[in-house]
A protein has these predicted regions:
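Short N-terminal mixed-charge amphipathic segments
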Residues: 1-54
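An amphipathic alpha-helix signature
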Residues: 57-61
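C-terminal charged interaction modules
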Residues: 72-124
């Protein structure tokens, strides 16, 4: 499948991605890390939370580089110019694409999320 994540990572490169076993495993590892970082019931010290967050960021960067085929220099540019929120959205986009979701469906989903967030802010 062809994937271009310019909207998230600011690099105009279309990658021809095959969801290999290693890529799917890395995507799953990232998803698990993201879910664990949101688990508010799990007792974690602040230090462990910071360590886990740093490990998750490294895993996410490895995943993006592996899927998109970015060079180390391109990854350095991404890390210096893209916010952590936008980077996380880009990782989510790549995972959805690897799961077979179309660009059109992803765009629709993102629009619904933004509207829900805007509605939540305006109702406060």
């Amino acid at each position: 499948m062809k994937i271009n994540a310019k909207n998230y990572f600011k690099i105009n490169k279309t990658a021809d991605v095959t969801p290999t076993n290693n890529i799917v495993r890395l995507a799953t590892k990232v998803q698990i890390g993201m879910l664990e970082s949101q688990d508010t019931e799990k007792e974690v010290t602040e230090l462990d939370a910071m360590k886990n967050g740093l490990e998750l960021q490294d895993d996410m960067a490895d995943f993006v580089q592996r899927v998109m085929g970015y060079t180390d220099k391109q990854m350095a540019t991404i890390n210096d110019t893209v916010s952590i929120e936008q980077f996380g959205e880009g990782v989510g986009y790549l995972i959805m694409r690897l799961n077979g979701i179309s660009d059109a469906d992803i765009k629709l989903s993102e629009q619904k999320q933004r509207k829900a967030m805007a509605d939540a802010k305006s109702s406060k």
